[in-house]
Amino acid sequence: MTNPKLDLLQPYPFEKLRAELAKTQYVGDLAPIALSIGEPKHPPPQFVIDALCDTDAMAQHLATYPATRGSDALRQAVADWLHKRFAVNASAEHNILPVNGTREALFAFAQAVLSGQPRSLVGMPNPFYQIYEGAALLAGATPYFLANTANTGYQADFEGVSERIWDATELLYICSPGNPTGHLVSDAQLQRLIELAHRHDFIIAADECYSEIYFSEERRPNSLLAASDAMGNKDFARCVVFHSLSKRSNLPGLRSGFVAGDAPIIEKFLHYR
């Protein structure tokens, strides 16, 4: 006996690609360039390796169960980084929750916040990170795909969504910078989405794992939390962001990240975990 909703899930694309690539034969001495999974190709920071090799510290931490909230020091470090990077004042105690990488967090978040009503919708960009779709389906909701095509400038046309659809929406996943388009959701668009979230009673889950990959200091990607703060929504109501060390710090194997935003929602997510 298994959950029948599992039959709704599509095969994980990266596992399928891995199997197909394993059959490929390469000609010549040049190593192939992998364009399948967004895996960093640079070494991890040395100070992280040094910390992991500190046997005394590791012996102390590995011998005890960690707190689900994470340590006070870790949450404060996240709060300090959010202030330095995005100029927002997030409470280490109430607005931040460390997670084991954002893949599982993005999935689990939907299970924690969706009502389970069969007609509820979860908005998401298309193309998209497959976790968004799976999270919606396993939570009993219906994915609503927002096409990112050449006709829309490779971005979601939020203004083209009807009031009826917004009314049925319980959760909206956005990804900025977007994968695979690289599109940035502007501050004006983020604030418009926050207005819609308040009007139609849904939550925005912003996947910001690519926020530190950019070419110019003048065009650094912004955060949903910063847009929220700038419009006076200083408690980040209905806004939650997901950050990971995988891409920005070349540490996908560490499975380390955090979720930050609306304090009551973070508390509910902590209760779920």
Where are the model-predicted features located?
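N-terminal small-domain helix-loop-helix segment of the aminotransferase-like
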Residues: T2-E104, A108
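Short catalytic/ligand-binding loop motif for oxyanion handling, primarily in non-cytosolic enzymes
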Residues: K41-P45, P180-H183, H200, E212-I213, ...
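Conserved core of the PLP fold type I
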Residues: H61-E195, E212-I213, E217-N233, V240
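Conserved core segment of the aminotransferase class I/II
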Residues: A226-R273
